[in-house]
Design a protein with these regions (language model features):
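N-terminal Rossmann-like NAD(P)+-binding subdomain of aldehyde/semialdehyde dehydrogenases
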Residues: 1-89
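Rossmann-like NAD(P) dinucleotide-binding subdomain of oxidoreductase/dehydrogenase enzymes
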Residues: 82-172
């Protein structure tokens, strides 16, 4: 756990300095690589949660739609917000990354729920550590494999944790 946290903190120190546009370009490659494995992922979903294979396409299609949408609005939504009230001073709100985001994803829609946290967090300059349900461990591994090919090292990590260790991470 400590090694993963430390490597994510170290990676975030440089990831956050890429422009939003640069991060979005890399994340689009991440999504593309992940979805290129859709047949393998569909079979794994069936084995892990017992969902009919005919329904796997819906989850992966939803993953793509959500990721594409969030990445398409990232530059606008992460831009500085001008709150200037007079001409003597320029006032603005600057959005800054938080650091490392720990995401816990459930078993029932493991990709569809994870995408809602991991893509915006990374687009904003944070690194992500994903903990999937013990019932769907291969989901985190598939995302990690795509991250290894397309993102800087340790921007996306995963941990397989039991309940006790998961609580330790979130309480620390």
């Amino acid at each position: 756990i400590e090694d993963t946290l430390n490597s994510s903190v170290k990676a975030q120190a440089s990831w956050c300095y890429l422009s939003v546009k640069e991060r979005v370009e890399l994340l689009n490659k991440f999504v593309e690589d992940f979805l290129s494995k859709k047949d393998v992922i569909a079979e794994e979903l069936c084995r892990q949660i017992g969902r009919p294979i005919s329904q796997a396409a819906g989850e992966l299609g939803g993953f793509k739609e959500r990721a594409d949408y969030m990445l398409s609005i990232a530059e606008k939504k992460l831009a500085d917000i001008d709150v200037t009230k007079d001409n003597n001073f320029k006032n603005f709100i600057k959005r800054r990354p938080l650091g490392v985001v720990f995401v816990i994803a459930p078993w029932n829609y493991p990709y569809l729920t994870a995408v809602n946290s991991i893509i915006p967090a990374m687009a904003a300059g944070n690194c992500v550590i994903l903990k999937h349900s013990a019932q769907t461990p291969l989901c985190a591994e598939q995302l990690y494999q795509s991250a290894q090919k397309t993102l800087p090292k340790n921007v996306f990590n995963f941990l397989h944790l039991n309940h006790k260790d998961g609580l330790k991470v979130v309480s620390d």
